[in-house]
Structure formats: structure tokens, C-alpha cells
Amino acid sequence: MRARYDDHPASRHRTSAKGCLAAHAGPDGRVSPDGRAPTDGSFLDRSFLDARVAGDRAAYLTDPNRLSYPNMRPSLLAFVAALPLIVGFALSGTHANPALPVVQFHDNAITSGRMVNGEHSLSLGIRRAMWHPYGEQRAGLEMFAFTAADGRPVMPAPMLRVKVGTKVHVSLTNPTDSTFVVHGLQSRRAVEDSIVLAPGESREVRFTADAQGTFYYYATFLGQGLRVGRFSDAILSGAYIVDGPGGAPKNEHVVVLSLIYDSRNPNGTASFSTELGVMNGRPWPYTPRLVYELGDSVRFRFINASNDIHPMHLHGAFYRVDSRGALMNDSVYSADQQRMSVTERLLPGETTSLVWSPERPGGWLLHCHFFLHTTPNIPYGAERKTPEERRRLRAEQHGKMDPNRHVLDEMGGLMMAVEIRPPAGWTMNAPTRRQLRLVLPDDSTSSDSSRLYTPSVGDGDRLTPPVTREGPGAPLILRQDEPTSIRIVNNSPEPTGIHWHGMELESYYDGVVGVGGTPGQITTAVMPHSTFEARMTPPRAGTFIYHTHLFETAQLSRGLFGALVVMPPGKDFDPTHDHIYIMGDTRTNGTSLNGLRALPPLQLTAGESHRLRFINITMVNAGLQMHLLGADSSTTQWMAVAKDGMDLPAHQRVMRAASQPVSIGETYDFEFTPVAPGRYLLQLRLPNGRVRAQQSFEVSARQ
């Protein structure tokens, strides 16, 4: 059944202490008058964790009272190890200051301000406050935050949400000793402007909400901007939503994405080893859980108020992209402009609105696919670790990874979970299936302690090895509408879990240990020297990805990823006219194309069409680009045919310049027909334009 992306009559938005947005409830369901959970530490008991390890998923995802986790060791496992160990210096005032108010969190559930004399009136102040991303019982950072009408500092900044045509009046005050520049509090059809707010200054701002869409406002120190790594001014961002005459839609979540840095490099720039990504002020696992029923339509507005790219990925389903915008403009798509996607790239300062109608129950992740932004949360402020302490922690934790604690110890940052409740009597069907194998090797030698996980693919008695032993793995070729079983054979000494990126399948098989599945059947790790059967029936032909979703730090960088191609009924994969290009990271070549920097030439014939499938599953290269140069060294043309495995509608299948950004977790399919003989060059380029890998197409004339 094809997903419906309209408002269902049964849709309902749960906002009670035991509902969709009950992220601030205490253990007994208590919610304080200001919407915060009790701060007596009572909701920090271990019952949820004990239940989680025992396999009771209801206590993890569906119980909103277990949202702050005890004993979350900051496990700087391996990615920070791969970063340069730069000795950063602490920001002034990063230790807890008991004299400062504490930043309160909210999820943009209500608009701030009220109507006064025909204007929507809103008071905003800026003040110093303590921000505790892991709860008030943990160390915090001294930050600047916008305040609500009652003077409380909040993150994100108070949401301004009005109907188009509303007159807005904002009172700004700055009682601090710093100068701030405020952006975004203005009409959208005017020339972009800003407000300089000096220490002790107050300003009155009036404008009309003259354009419908997803916008935002933000403040920075004088001389700073949104696209640089920010420190104590990094949480000064808020949503500004302008609805149509009908008002706000149901079941919508407005999410502000932020990155905060805790220390600087010697040259004064932000140290990425102290970067923390937050959704509405909190990182995973402190982000709210959303709970819906089958048939509900769920809407998201994402605002990238940070300095980096965020490819936002939904597990197990497609969402519809309804708009794309930025600070001063938003393109709300008409029906023929809308498209389906599983990963949407957001550049710094960009916004988007998405609609998802879930068709399968279970636990699903929605997260940034930039690996840096979902790694374990770093210790902040007084809990900060020195480089020496990091090395010691890595040595102590080597080989001690516990898959049952993966959701707590190995995941963090820009990630949230959505629970789709199964209807009464729901079961997974089990038709006769084609049998495939994904075989992970036991690859260790006395001279190499760093294992390679690059898998082979088995179909019957045949076992297809990867092209290179450093990744990617051999491609999996499936058939549309054919029930298929993929048996993961883990011959390695470490547990793993395989995610079928972009595939529409049951949550239990999605590959996220501790999140996937339904009560009574929880996704578990594929333990060493054991197997796991993943079942799927691909509803569409296209280009997808398989990759590890457990201990990604070690396994993704050592080859545990590959292409997953679904062919239409009656068609076989033809490698002479169908070409897979997967961008990944290897130990020898770093970011590469099919594991190589220089690929062997392809022999093509002028006038014959070829399908080029591009996949980005690198760890940190969210801004890679694919270019195809013609025989005259200028950019040639190709035709876009699919995005993330979903065929584009006919009116979007157009010839365009052969240049395409491909962010992490995205796939793109193009049809290329060389019109003239000669030497063409397919290039993988870094964001700065430097060529990272390439392959020549040697095109001969048709005989």
C-alpha cells in the first residue's frame, strides 16, 4: 500500500505527561507548572536501564518518565581518537555558577506573546544563564540565552508563530555587558537588516508577517555570524513560523538544530573535539520521544541554526519534502514540486518542512547522518577531560563495548526516536522468501590489530567478495516486490547491527539495537559468530545502502557498508550499463570512491545510455560533490531519475548540468548518454573543489 501524506481524521497530538511530547515529566508523571520535570533527582533511577538491558522496550521508548539517564559515562570511544588531540583551553565561566538562572527547555509547542491592540506583542531579553544539556545534576556551561516574558532563560529562544498578515511588535532588552546583533525580526519581503543591541539598551521592533513559511531569528556577538563555530552565544536562536489563514497544522514538531563548542584551538577557532549537537537544546538521549498510531500524519519543521551541514535521515520510511528555505525566504512547494526522500541535506541557516505517514509500527530514529553530530556526548565544563584522560579512557574501554548499552553510550547529539504503536492483533507476515547472506569476515592477523569488516554477499552457493578488502562490501541486489531474507553471518569477534538505509521494512529488522522492534520483539545485536535474519519485501526499485548501526566508530571506517540495489520486476543488474559509486572512508585511501582514489577506466559507446548510482556513506564528508566533465573538459549533462531510491516524477526528470552535491546518507541516480566520442572524467570533489577520486570514461564511436 502506498503511503498517504494527508491529514488523517484519526490524527491526534499527544501533549500530556504520558503523551507525544512529555519529555519533561518526572517518574510519577509529575510536571511542574513551568513544564519542567522535578529537579530532586528522583527520575534518575536505574529502573528504565535495567528493563532496557532485560529487553523491556516499553520502559525505554514508550515511557516518557525515563528520559534522563543515570551513569552515562562519556565514552569518547574512537572517533575522538581519530581527531587530532588538540589541547583546547577552557572558556571562561564554563563551571557552574549557582548565582545564575538555569536555562529551561521547551519544544516549541506554543507561541510566545499575545495580541495587544491589534498586534502580536512579544518581549525578548538576553541574559547570562547556566545551560545543563545533561540535566541539572551534571556540569553546565555559562551561556547567553533569550528570555521568555517572565524573564526565564529558555532554549530554544521563544517561538514566534502567527498567521500571515499579522502585525508583530517585539520589545528587545539587553541587560548584559555584551553587544549583540539580532537577525530575523523583520518582514521577509524587505531587505535583510539587523539590530545592534548595545549593553543596557532596549529597542522596539515592529513588522508585518508578510510571507508564509518556516523562518527563525538569532543573535550573535558583534562581528560573529551563523556560519562560524560559536560558544557562549550559540543557543540564541528561535523559530519564527508564519502559518496560512487556516493556522497551524496538527501533529507538527518545530525543531531547532544547534551546535555548541566548549573550547578553542590554539588559533582561536572552535575545537571540533568539544562539539555538541542539540535538538531544541538537548542531545540524545535527552531528546523527547514522540508517540503516534498507524495512520497518523506527522509533520516536522527543521531549522538549522548552526554552522554545519545536517543531512536529516528517517529510518524505515520516506517523508514528503514540503518546503525549503532560509532566514529570509521559504519556498513552499506546490503539489508538483514536492518530492519524497529519506535524507534531506540542510546547509547552515537552511530550513525545511517534512510530512511522514508511518505505515509500520515500532521504534524509528530520525537523526542527522553526519557522524560527528551523533557520536557520544562529550563531558562539558567541570567534567571536561584532558587529552591524556581521553587516551586512558580509550585504552580502558578497548574491547569492552556492550551492545545492550549502545543506545546510551554510543549514541548522542542530533537524534530523536519516534514510537509507532502497533494496533491490536498486529503481527509480521512471513511469506516464503528468497535467501541471501551477508557474511562478515573474521579478519585479524598478528601484524594488524585493526580489523576489516568488509562483507561478502552470498546467493545460494555463490559468495561474491568485495572489490577491495577495505570497503565497500559487495553489493546486495534485490528484486522489487520479492520477499527476501538476508541472513547476517557475523564471523567477526565483535557484535554488530546492520541498518538497511532507505528500505521500507518492519522496525525489528531495521538494525538499530535497542530502538527497533515492538514490545515483546526487540532488535538485538548480531553477536560474534552468530546470525540474524533480516526480512524485507522491497516495494520499489532504486538505490539504497546497507551499513553498520552499532559501534559505527570502528566498523563503518573499516568497511562495514555497501550498496543495496533493488531491480524492477523482470530486469537483472547489468554492470556494463549500471554503475555503482559509493563514497566511503577506508584506512588506506581515506574518503574514496568504491574504496579507491583512481578507478579503472570504463569503456563506453556514444549513444548508449548508462545509469550512474551515487551513494555517500562517509563519516564526516557531508559536502561531497560528483562532477562529470565532457570530452571538451567542460561540464556535460545527465538526467536525474531518482533520489534516495524513489523515482522522480516525469516532470522532474530533466537534463541538467552534470554536477550534484551528495550528502551523507543520500543516494542519487542519473542517466548519462555520451553524445560524442572522447575521454570523459567522473570526479568526486571535496567542498573546496579539490578532486578526491576520479574515473575516466573512454567513449568510442558507435560502429
Where does each model-flagged region fall?
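Extracellular/periplasmic metallocenter environments
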Residues: P175-V182, Q186-P249, Q338-G425, P493-T496, ...
